[in-house]
Design a protein with these regions (language model features):
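Conserved N-terminal substructure of TIR/SEFIR domains
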Residues: 2, 46, 57-123, 207-221
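Residues at the C-termini of beta-strands that transition into short coil/loop
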Residues: 94-97, 156, 193
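Short hydrophobic alpha-helical membrane-entry/anchor segments
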Residues: 32-39, 49-58
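Conserved beta-strand-loop-alpha-helix hinge of the TIR/SEFIR fold
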Residues: 118-146, 150-161
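Hydrophobic alpha-helical transmembrane segments of integral membrane proteins
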Residues: 16-24, 33, 37, 41, ...
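C-terminal interaction surface of TIR/SEFIR-family domains
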Residues: 63-67, 163-221
Length: 221
């Protein structure tokens, strides 16, 4: 596999706030037509801005298609717990036998499988165990996601209890292994969350939808 090569991050955008502003302006115009004067402008602007913000909230209620990137051998049982959270639409789980058969087919087969399963996903969620940051296919998925303009985020899952092995040692941030030409790390623009050690599952369950929405809204690629 070739070495990581990332496109430079974009500057922060005000696009989402601009949409609300446009809604407010449109509301002011309509309000002034219906009720000429300052009162109509103010009322219409407030109504339009509120509608723009509420439309964004309604959109966020739908399940967002995501791709889970993780170290299969070590963390598949922990990842399954995340899959069971109903608010997220993840890529279909692969059984150990299917994964081994895919790997035996060669690197090209694995890459094609990743490319096809990632194609229509809006966000790539890297679920980080002890050795995730060193895995070649995780690195490929991160690089591809960034260069394809998809949202990215990481979640440490070492405190989720695997039925076989319990919890595990916290792994490194995989986004630290990517460096832009400027010298900045990918981790400087991609969020990585470390859930509570006391209630890791509840923390992830309560927040993952919001984390994903935030990653999509604020992505820099």
């Amino acid at each position: 596999m070739r070495g990581p090569k990332l496109g430079a991050p974009k500057q922060d955008t005000t696009y989402k706030n601009g949409k609300i502003l446009l809604s407010a302006i449109a509301g002011s115009i309509v309000g002034n037509i219906l009720t000429p004067g300052i009162g109509g402008l103010i009322f219409g602007g407030i109504a339009g801005g509120t509608l723009g913000a509420s439309n964004k909230k309604v959109t966020n209620m739908a399940k967002i298609p995501v791709f889970y990137s993780f170290h299969f051998n070590n963390d598949v049982m922990r990842v399954q717990q995340v899959r069971n959270i109903g608010s997220i639409e993840g890529n279909p789980p692969t059984t150990p036998n299917e994964w081994e058969r895919l790997k035996r087919s060669g690197d090209r087969a694995v890459q094609n499988w990743i490319d096809q399963n990632m194609k229509y996903k809006r966000c790539i969620v890297v679920l980080i165990g002890t050795e995730t940051a060193t895995r070649p296919w995780v690195k490929y998925e991160i690089e591809k996601a960034w260069n394809d303009g998809k949202a990215l985020l990481g979640i440490h899952i070492h405190n989720l209890r695997c039925p076989r092995n319990g919890t595990c040692r916290k792994g490194a941030n995989p986004f630290d292994t990517f460096t832009f030409d400027s010298g900045a790390k990918l981790s400087s623009v991609v969020p990585c969350y470390d859930p509570s050690s006391v209630s890791a599952y509840a923390d992830i369950s309560n927040n993952i939808a919001g984390w994903i929405n935030s990653a999509i809204d604020n992505k820099r690629n």
